[in-house]
Amino acid sequence: MKEFKFNDEQLSTIQELEVDIDLKKLEIAISKESIDELSEDELLALLKVTNALYRSGFPVIEDILYDSFWNKFALNHPNHPFITSVETEVLNLGKTVALPQKMLSTDKAYSKEEIKKWLDRILKAAEELDIDTNEIEIRITPKLDGYAAFDDGERLYTRGDGVKGQDVSRAFERGLKVVRNSERGLGAGEIVINKAYFEKKLSQYFENSRNIQAAIIAEKNVDERVLEAIKEGACVFHPFAVLPNWTGNYQDLMTDFDGIIEQVWNSVEYDVDGVILEATDTRIKEHMGANRKFHRWQIAFKINDEVAEVEVISVTPQTSRTGRVTPVAELVPTRISGAMISRVTVHHYNMVKINGVGPGAIVQIVRSGLVIPKIEKVIKPVDPQMPELCPSCKSHLLWESDHLVCPNKSDCPAQTENTLVHFFKTLANNDGFGPKNIEKLANLGVKHIHQMYDLKPHQFAMYGFGEKTSKNLYDQLQASKNIEIEDWRFLSAFGVSRLGGGNCEKLLQHYSLRELFEATVEDIAELNGFARVSAEAIVKGLANIKEEFFKVYDLGFNLSITPKQSELESLASPLTGKIVVFTGKMLQGKRSDMEKHAKALGAKVGTSVTSNTTYLIAGLKVGETKINDAKEKGVKVLSEQEYLDLIS
């Protein structure tokens, strides 16, 4: 058992509650995940404290554990105000005002049997109203795990106690948008952040997404990274009214319960902690009504995450192409959610250090559905050993914030080899230089991209390749220079931090490649979508690759130039500023050519459909599921001919 201690931020939140409680007792209960030693008053205090911390962005126990504690208190005190009222927030965010309409909590069910009991109550209400039960429809939507709020078109309010909330309109003033740029005033919803965006860009800085959601509405200055997420549309207000849904007969629901629940659960790009089921008939809603806390015609279905306690065998350091050393926990093989799990990645070595992850540690891993397993907590910590040397080049590692980093950028095999792999993988026009051939060449001293292009056929032969293979490799290198490639793709192939394909394309809409290397932090930070922290990383990264970049650039690659923003804005095109995605086989030419043409007309071309996509252009052999998913997200689906008519 790892001993739990409230940190300073959590203690500050608890002080605002003004609860009279021995915090040491609460820390012990949280450590043990047991309330056996607490009195009823202490249990109530624990519920208030953990609820307050959760709503403030500092969750300390799992939802399922909180629900079990809540259920035990409710069993003994069913009429207590804490049980019968909406759980209130504790953050002092602004003026408290009456909500335009009540925002109640939702009752919960954890099994199909509980859902059947709820449906029986719906059927009973229908019979009492003389409604044909065969006509009863159930609507199911994802249960967003965000920050609940209400948008009346002019102001944004927190849920508060369900009757009164706090004015947090500052979130919209900071740039927060309604999902898919929908209109304001759609009522209740949640502030959420795109899961993939959080994992890729924010998880190393914030412990969980609730930290982000709370920060968006807080009175204090907002972290630049959060503002950048808002600018990029990763953080949005998602009204419940525009959620994707399944609506159908209750009998159909029970026939394919698991399949329907899974479909709805995975229909959004945000954290979801269940689905919401509700009767659609307004007569049934009015008849069943609500108590002080829940609507009786509505229920949330939640699935318990599958967890397992596993022993750590070792922690293996792996050096990435950026130089960061990632800890990988090797585990005693354990089956969870139908898969054999033997390793999990830990975010960074500071987590290893703080949480005590090392050989002999007992960790709890969790896997929700098909999600990659992660360490949820450490049950039995150990004193971990921190690596001092890079596992690849044996250079002494340095601490940079939470990360151990190898400073040997030019000679570390892992960094140079992975950089070469990344370059050829990103260019995607040369299948002879995969990881195996690159590893072979790197081991023989070919460390840089320009060195690879300097090789002659006889040198490949000297490195152990056959005569025919040597000629093929040489020919492929020469061909890769002649095949047309976008300038943004060429730049992104060098693997600079914060310079993926999307950001490269944005920057090259304002600068040529040569101009970009002269841009300052201030220049880049002024552009839409680039916060200062990103600008600093980009300028530093470009400086690091400048010499190598121009050695390769000067070899004469056939680069197509990204149209400049000023040119795009002057276009009178129906695609200007729109986000389009192409899918399926096209009849009028290659899909890649159509994508390039769409960009020239001012469109942004995506690789997958999201809630921000404007058009999905569907060619031949596109599955019905993909089409329906796009429509549920509010995306207009065009055939190839409809698209051509649009742009002609």
Swiss-Prot record:
Family the entry assigns: Belongs to the NAD-dependent DNA ligase family. LigA subfamily.
TM ranges: none
SMART domains linked: BRCT (SM00292), LIGANc (SM00532)
InterPro entries per UniProt: BRCT_dom (IPR001357), BRCT_dom_sf (IPR036420), DNA_ligase (IPR001679), DNAligase_adenylation (IPR013839), DNAligase_N (IPR013840), NA-bd_OB-fold (IPR012340), NAD_DNA_ligase_OB (IPR004150), RuvA_2-like (IPR010994)
Top EC class of this enzyme: ligase
The protein, known as: DNA ligase
Entry EC number(s): 6.5.1.2
Binding-site positions, Zn(2+): 390, 393, 406, 412
Catalytically driven reaction(s): NAD(+) + (deoxyribonucleotide)n-3'-hydroxyl + 5'-phospho-(deoxyribonucleotide)m = (deoxyribonucleotide)n+m + AMP + beta-nicotinamide D-nucleotide
Function: DNA ligase that catalyzes the formation of phosphodiester linkages between 5'-phosphoryl and 3'-hydroxyl groups in double-stranded DNA using NAD as a coenzyme and as the energy source for the reaction. It is essential for DNA replication and repair of damaged DNA.
Sorted UniProt keywords: DNA damage, DNA repair, DNA replication, Ligase, Magnesium, Manganese, Metal-binding, NAD, Zinc
Residues annotated to bind NAD(+): 63-67, 105-106, 159, 190, 302
Entry annotation: catalytic residues: 143 (n6-amp-lysine intermediate)
Lineage start: Bacteria, Pseudomonadati, Pseudomonadota, Gammaproteobacteria, Alteromonadales
Domain BRCT, first and last residues per copy: 570-648
BP terms from Gene Ontology: DNA repair; DNA replication
